[in-house]
């Protein structure tokens, strides 16, 4: 029996997210377009995943407040979480950490190092290459969280209990990375 995972899709055009996570996860993904304020009305999932977004967690948007409230309740219910990019930042913020704008935009294939302590990256070389695209970062970890991955731009992975979060995009394939990078209007 496969896992039932709530895919809390925060991308404003979620087609790539949907395709990439369905390819990478052997699970029954139940998708919710959280940018339209669509959230589960229950907590009957084996796990939840919060995707990336072009939004910032500190924006005053009703959908972000709704998402953060639901995530907080789901964590209290003991549901395991994975956050990717915006999801990483949202989980940090929800758990009491600080998210802030960066001085430089991090985009492209980057080297990240992990400390070998986290089962999420078991079997991955301690120095590995990932695709990143973000202009915000976790400036301060939530109380009780442990960092397990980083690079020169900052925190790239943390864990608190059954909540795991990564700043990079493990789900991106080369076509998605190229599409995302070519669509950015950078200084």
For the regions a protein language model found, what residue spans apply to each?
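N-terminal beta1-alpha1 cap of cysteine-dependent amidohydrolase-like domains
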Residues: 1-69, 73-77, 187
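Cysteine-nucleophile active-site neighborhood
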Residues: 51-118
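Pocket-forming structural segment of enzyme catalytic cores
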Residues: 95-175
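Catalytic metal-binding/acid-base residues of hydrolase active sites
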Residues: 33, 55, 87, 136, ...
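Short amphipathic alpha-helical segments
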Residues: 18-19, 60-63, 95-96, 143-144, ...
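Acyltransferase
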Residues: 172-187
């Amino acid at each position: 029996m496969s896992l039932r995972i709530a895919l809390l899709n925060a991308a404003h055009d979620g087609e790539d997210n949907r395709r990439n996570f369905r390819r990478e996860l052997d699970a029954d993904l139940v998708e919710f377009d959280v940018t339209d304020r669509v959230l589960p009305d229950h907590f009957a999932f084996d796990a939840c995943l919060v995707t990336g977004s072009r939004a910032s967690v500190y924006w005053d948007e009703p959908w972000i407040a709704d998402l953060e409230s639901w995530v907080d309740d789901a964590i209290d219910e003991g549901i395991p979480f994975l956050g990717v990019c915006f999801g990483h930042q949202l989980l940090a913020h929800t758990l009491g950490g600080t998210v802030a704008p960066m001085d430089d935009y991090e985009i492209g294939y980057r080297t990240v190092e992990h400390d070998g302590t986290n089962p999420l990256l078991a079997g991955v070389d301690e120095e590995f290459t990932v695709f990143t695209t973000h202009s915000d970062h976790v400036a301060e970890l939530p109380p009780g969280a442990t960092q397990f991955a980083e690079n020169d731009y900052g925190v790239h992975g943390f864990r608190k209990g059954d909540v795991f979060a990564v700043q990079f995009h493990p789900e991106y394939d080369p076509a998605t990375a190229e599409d995302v990078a070519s669509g950015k209007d950078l200084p």
